[in-house]
Amino acid sequence: MKNVEILLDDPKKAVIEVSKPIIVATFIESIYSLVDSIWVSGLGADALAAVGASFPILISIYAVSWGLSIGISSGIARRVGAKNKEEADKVANHAIILALIAGILYIIAVYPNLDTLFSLMGTYGDCKSLAIKYSSILVLGTVIFTICDALYGIFRGEGNTKIVMIASVIGTLTNIILDPIFIYMLNLGISGASYATLIAIIISLLILAYELFIKKSCYVTVKLSKFKPDLKIIADLIRVGIPSALIEITVAVSFFIMTSIIMMVGDSRGLAVYTGALRITEFGFIPMLGLASGATSVIGATYGARSFEKLKTAYFYTIKIGVLMEIIIVALIMLLSPILAYLFTYTKTSMGIHEELVKALRIVPLYLLFTPFILTTSAMFQGIGKGEKSLIISIFRSLICHISYAYLFAVILGLGMFGIYSGLVVGEFTAGIFAFLFGVLAIKALIKSK
């Protein structure tokens, strides 16, 4: 198939061709994330803060589904590179079953404990009740997220990212349309945003399922009726999937701790500003995430084919494109910060944070300049099936660098919210240097071992 040929061709061309649809999809998703927050912010600062407080919960859902999805992409890509279709088919079958089990286990573990989790984060009053209302609906729909991302992983693994883009964009546009209808017209408030998200994910899932099971446009063949557990495949998916999931969980834990630090030096107002700044900054982060996602498939295929020089080319080219992209995005966000801030301060209940949000948008986006080194290196390790090394990078980045610098600047040095923003940037810079050196040494070792 053409998408498989692209994966095994020129690595620079492959990175661009595989990543383009994912970048488009993730860019549209970032627009949704922003629009979602804009509609919610119309309910007041407490509602926007509630979405921010829910971030660790949402990230943990994302961790389970996306972590498994990365494991699936890597597993299939490596087998495509090795030209072993039978094993790729087995990975796809295991993917769907494991996604179902993971989703059910998550619901059982998290849903009964939401109240306790938000209390531990230091949220209280209206902010806490709104956060529970917003996140509980999404938690109950976790199985939908996990199965949908498993199918995304199957298509990405074979380089068929056009289908990924179509399903994602249609789902996202549906979400954007449904948000104001559910939140305001149906008077569901913050719960309406959650219902809109679930319906959108279901639509994306149906599109992917149609392509895989009915149209059969996929390179791999999925026949669940012939599923037989294979411990070797399960172990392979777990080796990449669990560290990938833990990477997202470290981000959630980091935000959990960061929320506590923010509440120490500020209040729900400070959290609302931080949340707004992050949502706008996602415009820069999420396209890079799409580029790294494409790189995972390309690097996985080159690794499976044992073409380590191509792997090296794909790695450095992805970083180069990522840095150039981030420079442009950061410049635009900082230049347009007074205008962008109005996206979250357009009502009487939220206009009081406009000036603070503008200040945040002139500092926070700077961390994006160092993100390509981190995400590309993490994608490289995931692609070659060494997810535990990606986890090491994430722990160093989120739990050591971000938290340590934020606490140092905000609390110990008494810089308040400015310290939070500065800590994020300095932490990303430090983690970027570490990740890049780690990646370069790993590639040298691969080339030497051949």
UniProtKB/Swiss-Prot annotation:
InterPro entries hit by this protein: MATE_fam, MdtK-like, Membrane_Transporter-Flippase
Transmembrane segments: 22-42, 48-68, 91-111, 135-155, 163-183, 188-208, 245-265, 283-303, 321-341, 363-383, 400-420, 423-443
Membrane topology: Multi-pass membrane protein
Keywords: Cell membrane, Membrane, Transmembrane, Transmembrane helix, Transport
Location within or outside the cell: Cell membrane
Keyword Transport: yes
One Gene Ontology CC term in the entry: plasma membrane
GO molecular function: antiporter activity; xenobiotic transmembrane transporter activity
Source species, domain of life: Archaea
Keyword Cell division: no
NCBIfam families named in the record: matE (TIGR00797)
Family listed: Belongs to the multi antimicrobial extrusion (MATE) (TC 2.A.66.1) family.
Official protein name in the record: Uncharacterized transporter MJ0709
Native species: Methanocaldococcus jannaschii (strain ATCC 43067 / DSM 2661 / JAL-1 / JCM 10045 / NBRC 100440)
Organism placement in taxonomy: Archaea, Methanobacteriati, Methanobacteriota, Methanomada group, Methanococci
